[in-house]
A protein has these predicted regions:
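Glycine-rich loop-to-alpha-helix module at the N-terminal edge of alpha/beta enzyme cores
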Residues: 1-57, 68
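Short alpha-helical
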Residues: 16, 20, 31, 42, ...
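Conserved small-residue-rich beta-alpha loop and adjacent elements
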Residues: 60-134
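Generic non-transmembrane alpha-helical segments
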Residues: 9-20, 122, 126-131, 174
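Conserved NAD(P)+-binding/catalytic subdomain of aldehyde/semialdehyde dehydrogenases
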Residues: 80, 129-185
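Hydrophobic packing residues within well-ordered alpha-helices of enzyme cores
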Residues: 47, 120-123, 150, 171
Length: 185
């Protein structure tokens, strides 16, 4: 219930600051105003989606699945997840990743593109303002060195990447070689 409340707080802050986020996208990235507002609107929809499933992530119990056998399903967070996001959707892609990871009980490290980091940084400020405890959502800026550190870090269980195919292949091969779950689009 606490995660849902925090996600709702975050959603409300993103809605209140929608024009500010869109303005940052327009100024730093160069998106036209309508596209920037659309990017933020899609991100808000994803926060709402995460709010809807956060409370339903519970295990199950099935009695007598077989003779003398009961079945338990336990849903557990992965732990620390990371997201490496592209320059062309600096607000929407983090808003795909962060709410879903947090709704599932994970902590999250965001590594935005170094080309346009102000909108992602502002989103992290809104997360803090929403009341998320320190360390639940974190921001790491940098280039390939930062990416490599995330892919190599033993405490990071999963990495999601959105970007070009050559870099996706690199993220996938490097991350899986260290035992991480990788989503590379």
């Amino acid at each position: 219930a606490r995660r849902v409340k925090l996600l709702h707080n975050f959603r409300n802050l993103v809605i209140e600051n929608e024009m500010e986020i869109a303005s940052r996208l327009t100024q730093e990235h160069g998106k036209v105003a309508d596209d920037a507002r659309g990017e933020v609107a899609r991100g808000i929809e994803n926060i709402e989606f995460a709010c809807g499933f956060a409370d339903s992530l519970k295990g199950t119990y099935s009695e007598h699945a077989s003779t003398g056998v009961d079945v338990y399903t336990v849903r557990q967070p992965l732990g620390v997840c990371a997201g490496i996001t592209p320059f062309n959707f600096p607000a929407m892609v983090p808003l795909w990743m962060i709410p879903n990871a947090v709704a599932c009980g994970n902590t999250f490290v965001l590594k935005p593109s170094e080309r346009d980091p102000s909108a992602p940084r502002f989103l992290i400020e809104l997360i803090q303002e929403a009341g998320f405890p320190p360390g639940v959502v974190n921001l790491v800026n940098g280039d390939k060195t930062a990416v490599d550190r995330l892919l190599e870090h033993p405490d990071i269980a999963a990495v999601s990447f959105v970007g070009s195919t050559p870099i996706a292949k690199y993220v996938y091969s490097t991350g899986t070689s260290t035992g991480k779950r990788i989503q590379a689009l």
